[in-house]
Structures are given as structure tokens and as C-alpha cells.
Amino acid sequence: MEKRKDTKTTIAKASDAQNKSWYVIDATGKTLGRLSSEVAKILRGKHKVTYTPHIAMGDGVIVINAEKVHLTGAKKGQKIYRYYTGYISGMREIPFENMLAKKPSYIIEHAIKGMMPKTRLGKRQLKSLRILKGDCYKTFEAQKPILLDV
């Protein structure tokens, strides 16, 4: 951490961002947007005192029980995920309920991705995100994840 001579602002170096913590967040009964914004803050590193916008200072996040996330109001029946296959008339639309049954991790990943910067740094920070269906995260025991209540 280096301090500039003319200001009191401290600017972190890339070497300061090496010690990364991992957090486990349970998505059971959580609202999609509120959960996603908290995860995005942790991935970017905004929860740290030494946050520097141009350095990947964020921590890793493991989201479990992705299939138990919910939406408020009538959005459960109205929300549609769209993508284009690349072919003529290749626009596909999948309702939220079908996507939740088919690929629940995509729902959370899509929401978090929209809250991250659309730059190389944002893509690098997204690599620290793991979304799991179910509550078993034994494969990540080596990272010594901390259970976080959001």
C-alpha cells in the first residue's frame, strides 16, 4: 500500500490483492436482486477498506442452493430470458420458471453479470464466482470458505 505525498488517499497495489478470502452464501429464500447486489459487491471488493477500482481486489463467492432463489411480485410468471442462436429467426425465449428448473445457476449468474463492470477487469472478477445447485460445497474446502449470511 503506497501513500501519495500530496493527498491522504491510499492506493492499493496489485500485490496487496493476493490474499483472497472465500465466502459461502446460501440463496434459500433470498430475493434474486438483493442477493446478486451483495455478491457483486464482494466480487468487486467494495466491502474492503482498501478498495481500489482498477485492481481485482475482490474475494471469491460460492452461492449454494441456487434453485431456491425467488422473485417478488408477479415477476415469477412474467420474467423471460432471451438469447439469439445466430440463425435466421433464432430468437429463443425461456420463462423464469422453466429456466429455474433447467439451469438455476444461470439465473443468478445472469443477474450478477449485469451488475459487474463490462470490462476485462469485470470478467476477471467474475471468475471468482461459483454457483451450485444444492447445498454441498465440499469440493471447495481447500479454500476454507466462510459462511456469510446476507
Curated annotation (Swiss-Prot):
<dbReference type="InterPro" id="IPR036899">
    <property type="entry name" value="Ribosomal_uL13_sf"/>
</dbReference>
<protein>
    <recommendedName>
        <fullName>Large ribosomal subunit protein uL13</fullName>
    </recommendedName>
</protein>
<dbReference type="Pfam" id="PF00572">
    <property type="entry name" value="Ribosomal_L13"/>
</dbReference>
<comment type="subunit">
    <text>Part of the 50S ribosomal subunit.</text>
</comment>
<dbReference type="GO" id="GO:0017148">
    <property type="term" value="P:negative regulation of translation"/>
</dbReference>
<dbReference type="GO" id="GO:0003735">
    <property type="term" value="F:structural constituent of ribosome"/>
</dbReference>
<comment type="similarity">
    <text>Belongs to the universal ribosomal protein uL13 family.</text>
</comment>
<dbReference type="InterPro" id="IPR005823">
    <property type="entry name" value="Ribosomal_uL13_bac-type"/>
</dbReference>
<comment type="function">
    <text>This protein is one of the early assembly proteins of the 50S ribosomal subunit, although it is not seen to bind rRNA by itself. It is important during the early stages of 50S assembly.</text>
</comment>
<dbReference type="GO" id="GO:0003729">
    <property type="term" value="F:mRNA binding"/>
</dbReference>
<dbReference type="GO" id="GO:0022625">
    <property type="term" value="C:cytosolic large ribosomal subunit"/>
</dbReference>
<dbReference type="InterPro" id="IPR005822">
    <property type="entry name" value="Ribosomal_uL13"/>
</dbReference>
<keyword id="KW-0687">Ribonucleoprotein</keyword>
<dbReference type="GO" id="GO:0006412">
    <property type="term" value="P:translation"/>
</dbReference>
<keyword id="KW-0689">Ribosomal protein</keyword>
